[in-house]
Amino acid sequence: MTKTEFLEYVKKNNIDLKKYNFVIGEKSNTPYTVGCYEEGEKWYLYEVGERQNFSIVKSGDEKEIFNYLYFTLRGNINM
């Protein structure tokens, strides 16, 4: 899944990413956040813990990162 496909899925299903503490395309230090950002041609998936500890969970290409985000988001919502 690409970033565009992920965002289309979110829009189609009226999902508020902020409600689930998801951040796309930038770093955040908000506790309990899951997000991703791109540096160069590499994508990074991160989590922010209770005490604002920023941890990179995974790095890879766009499809790999957005597939992970998609399944994480699906696990957090009841559709």
Regions found by a protein language model. Give the residues of each.
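General N-terminal targeting signals
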Residues: 18, 23, 27, 32-34, ...
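Short, exposed beta-strand "edge-strand" segments with a Pro/Gly-rich flavor and a Y/T-containing core
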Residues: 1, 14, 54-60
